[in-house]
UniProtKB/Swiss-Prot annotation:
PANTHER family noted in UniProt: PROTEASE FAMILY C15 PYROGLUTAMYL-PEPTIDASE I-RELATED, PYROGLUTAMYL-PEPTIDASE I
Top class in the EC scheme: hydrolase
GO cellular component, one term: cytosol
Family from the record: Belongs to the peptidase C15 family.
Gene name linked to the record: pcp
Assembly and oligomerization: Homotetramer.
Domain of life per record: Bacteria
MF terms in GO: pyroglutamyl-peptidase activity
Catalyzed reaction equations: Release of an N-terminal pyroglutamyl group from a polypeptide, the second amino acid generally not being Pro
Name listed for the protein in its UniProt record: Pyrrolidone-carboxylate peptidase
Record-listed E.C. numbers: 3.4.19.3
Biological processes, Gene Ontology terms: proteolysis
Length: 215
């Protein structure tokens, strides 16, 4: 059965001129492979406004699966996130100058939400194509985690039939010309996200493999 997969990517932030999350996601708009039919939307790197845009995208597309994607400069792998926490703690301002500290995303909401995606399976499928990938256990405390938590809160409260989650991606090479940081080509990032969408559409259950972090 075909599943509509909504992918979201952010606009540039923190002085960058591109955001690879949107550059990759927009390439996949209208793509179809296996059980996945993909639609793409951009969200602003702004606390709360990003959630409002996401809610409108849900109304517009009525997806079965939502995968939000964000840039994690410094990471070397495609990293599906395991958990979102109920905390805004911004080291830098967002794109409208907001810099919340020690603030709950949802007053009265749970401390954390688990992903609804088969992230270990996604990682294995991406690695089969020679693309580095690993499960991540922290999505940070900036707008990426904010959107991830807000997505799972929205799903839990209003759309229990939707499965959702978040994937962080590295810089693309053009972002590292003036700094020493790992990067991954846009082609490989795009390929990995397509694999993630198809895998999520094909499988609800995750695989049982060892993982975790020691510190």
């Amino acid at each position: 059965m075909e599943k509509k997969v909504l992918l979201t990517g952010f606009d540039p932030f923190g002085g960058e001129t591109v955001n690879p999350s949107w550059e990759a996601v927009k390439r996949l708009n209208g793509a179809a492979e296996g059980p996945a039919s993909i639609v793409s939307e951009q969200v602003p790197t702004v606390f709360y406004k990003s959630l409002a845009v996401l809610r409108e995208a849900i109304k517009k597309h009525q997806p079965d699966i939502i995968i939000c994607v964000g840039q994690a400069g410094g990471r070397m792998q495609i990293t599906p996130e395991r958990v979102a926490i109920n905390l805004n703690e911004a080291r830098i301002p967002d794109n409208e100058g907001n810099q919340p500290v020690g603030e709950n995303i949802s007053q009265g909401g749970p401390a954390a939400y688990w992903t609804g995606l088969p992230i270990k399976r996604i990682v294995e499928e991406i690695k089969k194509e020679g693309i580095p990938a690993a499960v991540s256990y922290t999505a940070g405390t900036f707008v990426c985690n904010h959107l991830f938590y807000g997505l799972m809160d929205e799903i839990t409260r209003h759309h229990p039939h939707i499965r959702g989650g978040f994937i962080h991606i590295p810089y693309i090479p053009e972002q590292t010309l003036q700094k020493s940081a790992p990067s991954l080509s846009l082609d490989l990032v795009t390929k990995a996200l397509k694999i993630a969408a198809v895998t999520a559409a094909a499988h609800e259950d995750d695989i049982e493999t060892g993982g975790g972090e020691l510190h």
